Amino acid sequence: MKTCMNNPIIQQKFQDLQQKALKNIQGIDWEKPIYIFVTPNEYIGTVASVTDEKLLASSLQNLPTNWKPTKSNIDEDATWNSLKNGWQIAYKKHAILLMGPGNQQEAGTIRQTMREILNEDYDESFMSTPFYDELNQLKGDLNMISHINVLPIPYNTFMKLQLPENVSAQQTYLCSEIKIYQNKLCIQNTLNSNDKEAEKILEQQVTPQLTHFESFINTNNGIILYMHTYGEKLLHILREDPNFRAMLAGMNQVIDADLILRSIKGEALLQIQNFSESEVPTFTLQAQLANQNFMEKFPDWQKSAQKKKDMFIRPTHEGYHISYKNQHFFLNAGNNQLLLSSNAQIQCPKVKNSPHIMQSVTYMSINFDKLWRSSTNIQKNNSTNFIQSISEQLKSLEFKAKNCKKSTIDIYFR
């Protein structure tokens, strides 16, 4: 990631940061780009330009208590400082490298990683790669280039949703231009591939715009995910979240939920009202089907459920009521369409306050206030922890993909 210091909001943030954490730090050129990266061993690194090495050394002593250097030494590579908060600093004539965080046992590993970076030949460095040139051609206030698989959840999930069936995440990388406004971030994303065949597919793939379930979208829900998909892809996305993974495991005790979801092909609309106190979120899934042959298996699944405790399948006038322990699901399929819900009101009414998603082939929104309403005991995982950790600062998020290559993310702050 590369930052541009010309944006007035970024300048103000850095002034605030300098007053609080970097007070009196001198010797760093804050006007030049700052590069941020993540190492293969998952440490965060930051590189900035140094204008005066001696001035920098003396001013490091003016850091706040929780940032003050605890150890300092000089060798042939650089001047080294260990900070109290788990970060390591190395600087030499023209550059400063900050890396971490890590505990005391990790300090040696972090320093070794830093030493390898400091001693890299140009031909081995990031600067010699096409990615470096591509990064410097981006024109956002913040610019980022990354392989999809190393992005954090849910950001990597957004990108994977765009991919055609015959292009893998391993083949693609993301370029993002981030514009910063007073209460909003606008992120313009482009998916690229160094694989010529994959890049050709990304450029030429024509995905129809979402229309089939658009009128069913209800903006009172915490999460709305609307996309073109096929069963195996949707299964993979759901299994990344432990709450849905536990739900699928429970359903598979009674019916073959994997078989049902693998029958999906076409548009799919997943709406999560909120994360409830049980393991099962309050949700509704509507999807087009390649076939509904699984409905023929319900009589056999019913007989099997009758022989087991804590589970049942009951026909209703709208489909089937499926129960496993304290988990309840309601399913119906007809006209090659699936409706699966955690709510007994299985018929999904059309709503009038649907968001404007025209010209989108993938759409997702998160309303952070509505998502965590009445949720005090949800199953913790990286995804929910990430969202909860930022929900105090964020109001909502909206993701739109225009095609397989281009997408936007708008993040609104409180």
Regions found by a protein language model. Name each.
Residues 62-65, 203-210, 242-243, 354-356, ...:
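Short intrinsically disordered coil segments
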Residues 9-20, 72-78, 144-168, 242-272, ...:
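Generic detector of solvent-exposed, compositionally biased contiguous segments
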Residues 221-304:
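Long, K/E/R/D-enriched contiguous segments that form extended
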Residues 100-102, 108-237, 366-414:
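Leucine-rich, highly hydrophobic segment in Treponema pallidum outer-membrane-associated proteins
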Residues 1-7:
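N-terminal mature-domain "stem" immediately C-terminal to a signal peptide or N-terminal signal-anchor/transmembrane
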Residues 19-134, 266-364, 412-414:
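Single conserved position on a long alpha-helix in the C-terminal lobe of the eukaryotic protein kinase
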Residues 33-34, 173-177, 211-214, 256-260, ...:
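Generic recognition of flexible, low-complexity loop/linker segments
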Residues 7-9, 139:
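Short acidic/polar alpha-helix capping motifs at helix-coil junctions
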